């Protein structure tokens, strides 16, 4: 970066032109590359605003993002870094060899982090490290999480220790941030990942692609 030129010519692209390839976590086998077009970033914006209870580019900017999620992953890049920059919101960068709950509490407190995406595994480690002790100087405004169900105990811990409700959301690398909670406009319930993010239609279907009007215990699929 020190030797990079500060002048460049922007290449003209279409919204449908390929922008980048992000690899999945390999849920059903090895990681697979998901080719995302340039329009993907703008398509992500509503899905970021909902769990973070709406963002603003108005001055003065009061929000401040940080996440332990790697920026090479869809969660770090498209759930935090690029959307925050879209709004002109600063993002804290911190390099660590592995997730450390003590360092995380210290960083969020000292730097006055306002917004964070914390994967469920990170939240569970933080709860194990500090199950009940009040943490001083936390100024969090929003916490988003997704990847697996958090459970009632973890959600209640978030309210008591982090000082905010944790907004759970759902998405995949190739179709991210499609369903979400938003404590600012709807009650959050244990076991619920919220409602469809504006711009998406979400349906529960069976193996034959038929709509299930009243999902029960039978095998069903999320269709977006």
What are these regions (language model features)?
Residues 42-114, 128-129:
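Conserved AMP-binding/adenylation subdomain of ANL enzymes
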Residues 24, 222-224:
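Conserved small/polar residues in nucleotide/adenosyl-binding loops
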Residues 10-13, 191-197:
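Short Gly/Pro-enriched turn/cap motifs at secondary-structure boundaries
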Residues 3-23, 30, 55-64:
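Conserved pre-ATP/AMP-binding loop-to-beta segment of ANL
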Residues 86, 113-118, 127-188, 201:
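Gly/Ser/Thr-rich phosphate-binding loop
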Residues 18, 24-27, 65, 108, ...:
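Conserved S/T- and glycine-rich ATP-binding loop of Class I adenylate-forming
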Residues 1-4, 16, 39, 111, ...:
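Structural detector for helix-capping/boundary residues
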Residues 203-222:
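Conserved beta-loop-beta connector loops within the AMP-binding
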């Amino acid at each position: 970066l020190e030797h990079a030129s500060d002048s460049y010519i922007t290449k003209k692209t279409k919204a449908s032109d390929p922008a980048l390839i992000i690899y999945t976590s390999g849920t059903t086998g090895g990681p697979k590359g998901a080719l995302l077009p340039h329009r993907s970033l703008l398509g992500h914006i509503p899905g970021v605003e909902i769990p973070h209870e709406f963002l603003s580019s108005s001055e003065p900017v009061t929000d401040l993002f940080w996440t332990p999620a790697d920026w090479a992953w869809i969660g770090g890049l498209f759930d935090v870094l690029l959307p925050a920059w879209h709004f002109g919101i600063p993002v804290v960068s911190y390099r660590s060899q592995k997730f450390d709950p003590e360092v995380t509490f210290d960083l969020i407190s000292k730097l006055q982090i306002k917004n964070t995406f914390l994967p469920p595994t990170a939240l569970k480690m933080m709860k194990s490290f500090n199950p009940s002790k009040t943490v001083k100087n936390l100024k969090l405004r929003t916490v988003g999480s997704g990847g697996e169900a958090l459970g009632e105990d973890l959600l209640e811990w978030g309210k008591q220790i982090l000082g905010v409700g944790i907004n759970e959301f759902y998405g995949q690398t190739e179709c991210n941030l499609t369903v979400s909670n938003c404590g600012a406009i709807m009650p959050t319930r244990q076991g619920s990942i919220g409602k469809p993010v504006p711009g998406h239609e979400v349906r529960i279907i069976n193996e034959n692609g038929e709509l299930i009007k009243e999902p029960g215990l039978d095998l069903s699929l999320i269709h977006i």
